[in-house]
Amino acid sequence: MLIDQYLDAALLGLIEGLTEFLPVSSTGHLIIFDTLLGFEGPPGKVFEVVIQLGAILAICTVYFARLWKVVTGLKDDPGARHFAMAVILAFLPAMVLGAALHGVIKAVLFNPTVVSIALILGGVAILMAERLVPAPRYHQIERFPAPLALKIGLCQCLALVPGVSRSGATILGSLLMGVDRRTAAEF
């Protein structure tokens, strides 16, 4: 039994590692595989949080210098303040909507059927967006107008549906609003 749990944990860790940095929902994939493996309940949820911490640490490591420059430049650097304001504006819609709808989201949307549909629709959206992307107008987060950051945050609200990738929703929304690919991925 213990070996089965280790194999389940290794498989879920592999799934997280393969999907976290792609514009697909790593959480959605974990929900589906949790169900398939019977790895549910509080221990399964704690495990998901722990393996996702690795991805967060990786992002912090890769972007540490840039984030540190923003933090230390908040007082004197207008670009750092603008960057921080853009991030805050982009975060607000999902925070407010997520707090308001948390119970409904957990009760209705956290199931493999919803996740599967969201993953399929996300793939279709990526394919369609490739044909609709306008020429880029925005190349630096430090120069994002406030309304653009807020609109990107509204796109992020789509990721409140399990199976919709947060990075996928924000990258696609950013691209469709004229942000270049690299900047969209960084934001």
From Swiss-Prot:
Enzyme Commission no: 3.6.1.27
Family assignment from sequence similarity: Belongs to the UppP family.
Cross-referenced Pfam families: BacA (PF02673)
Location within or outside the cell: Cell inner membrane
PANTHER family documented for this protein: UNDECAPRENYL-DIPHOSPHATASE (PTHR30622:SF3)
Summary of the function given for this chain in its UniProt record: Catalyzes the dephosphorylation of undecaprenyl diphosphate (UPP). Confers resistance to bacitracin.
One MF annotation (Gene Ontology) recorded for this entry: undecaprenyl-diphosphatase activity
Protein name: Undecaprenyl-diphosphatase
GO cellular component, one term: plasma membrane
